[in-house]
Structures are given as C-alpha cells and as structure tokens.
A protein has these predicted regions:
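A generic structural micro-feature
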Residues: 77-80, 129-131, 167-169, 192
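Short, well-ordered strand-loop elements centered on a beta-strand within folded domains, enriched
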Residues: 92-100, 111, 138, 148-152, ...
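Short edge beta-strand segments in beta-sheet-rich domains
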Residues: 47-49, 134, 195, 204
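Catalytic core of DAGKc-family lipid kinases
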Residues: 1-120, 126, 171
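Internal helical hairpin/lid segments
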Residues: 107-152, 157
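A generic structural signal for short beta-strands and their flanking turns/coil linkers
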Residues: 82-84, 133-137, 173
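ATP/nucleoside-binding phosphotransfer catalytic cores, i.e., glycine-rich phosphate-binding loops
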Residues: 141-211
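Short low-complexity stretches enriched in small and charged residues
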Residues: 91-100, 129-134, 158-168
Length: 211
C-alpha cells in the first residue's frame, strides 16, 4: 500500500457542501448499488455524471443518514456535496465503486482487505476516519483466527476494533496487488467474482450528490 500525494478535497473541521436547490437532482439512487450503476453507465458512455439524489446506502449513512427520503430532497434541509469515487481494474475489466470494496476468499478464513470510501458497511463502522470527499481511501487488512473474527464482528458495530495489532490500516490514493490465489472482489455489496489482481485509485470530486 502506497500513499501518493498530499492534497485533500475537504479538510477536517471545514464546512462541507452547500444548500441544495429544490429539484436539483437529475436521477435518484436508494442505495450504493444504484448510485454505482449511474456512475458506471455515464463513465462507459463518456457522458457527464448527473447530479444524484441519494436516499439510502452506506454512503448515505456516512452523510448522516438523514430521514425523509425524496421529500427531504425537495426541502430546505437538502444539502449538495461533492463525492469521490474509486476507479477499479480487476484483471482486464474496469469498474467503479462508491462506498467500499472487500477482497477475500472467505469471511471466516484467509486474508481480508477492506478499501473504504465510506466509514460504514451495513451495521459495521469499518473505517471511523473515512470521509467520502477527503481525497483518500482507508484500507484495513488482516488474517485473524476464527475466535478473533467473532470478537471483531461485535466491535465493528461501534468502531472499537481499532487499533488492533492484527489489523494493518492506512490511508492511500492508489493500490495494486497480485493475489496468491483467485480472490473475491465485492464492490458496494456486489460480488464481482474471483480475480488474480487488482489496481485501483481515488477519483476526487467525481460526482455531486444531494441528500
């Protein structure tokens, strides 16, 4: 894992985003998979990524999980923010991820690597320091015994699993790895099959989200 560069899109303690205009969303996504599909479709067509109204998912939870659904997006409480995404190459196939990526052979044995743009994966607060617009990805990797994995699952709910001497963690902008055996790649909750290698990098300020 290598850190590259030193800039940040948003600085800690700095106000993030702006009040959103009513009707400002071009498309809507209720979860990370739907948001990812919108981004991938426009990247594939080489067309501008539309402004997306987001009402659910792990990225939405990192934004504070505001209630109200689409009704909120039309209200004075709606906010507009820039979001980073992850460009991913698995073998010779290109993908986008918006919230997180997991590399593993099994949840219960073998190494697991998490690449996080959002701090959340479901109920798990995997990367408490992660921010979806700071220009960095948070990476955690480990190969824990089964007993420690059970304990870790409990601590992931509150984010108290770090620091842990059995888990390597860091912040990166780019990442590449050759796997010793074909390894599952799970992008935003979607299993994209087993692959021998991966390369990825952060794409800062890739899209605008209203929430």
């Amino acid at each position: 894992m290598e850190m590259i560069g030193a800039w940040m899109t948003i600085k800690r303690g700095q106000d993030w985003g702006l009040p959103a205009e009513a009707g400002g969303a071009d498309q809507f996504a209720a979860n990370d998979m739907e948001l990812r599909a919108i981004v991938e479709a426009n990247c594939s067509d080489q067309t501008p990524i539309p402004v997306v109204g987001l009402t659910g998912g792990d990225l939405w939870r990192a934004l504070g999980a505001p209630a109200g659904g689409r009704r909120r997006l039309q209200s004075k409480e709606a906010r507009e923010v820039s979001i980073d995404v992850i460009d991913v190459c698995l073998g010779d196939q290109n993908y986008i991820a918006v919230a997180h990526i997991f590399f593993l052979t099994s949840w219960w044995r073998g190494p697991v690597t998490a690449v996080m743009n959002s701090e959340w994966r479901g109920r798990w607060r995997v990367a408490p320091r992660a921010h979806p617009n700071d220009g960095w990805l948070d990476v955690l990797a480990g190969d824990l015994p089964i007993r420690q994995r059970f304990l870790l699952r409990e601590r992931l709910v509150t984010g108290d699993h770090l620091p842990n001497s059995a888990i390597r963690s860091g912040r990166i902008k780019e990442f590449s790895q050759e796997f010793s055996r074909p390894t599952r790649a799970i992008l935003d909750g979607v299993d994209e099959g087993r692959h021998d290698s991966v390369s990825l990098k952060i794409r800062p300020d890739a899209l605008t989200v209203i929430y």
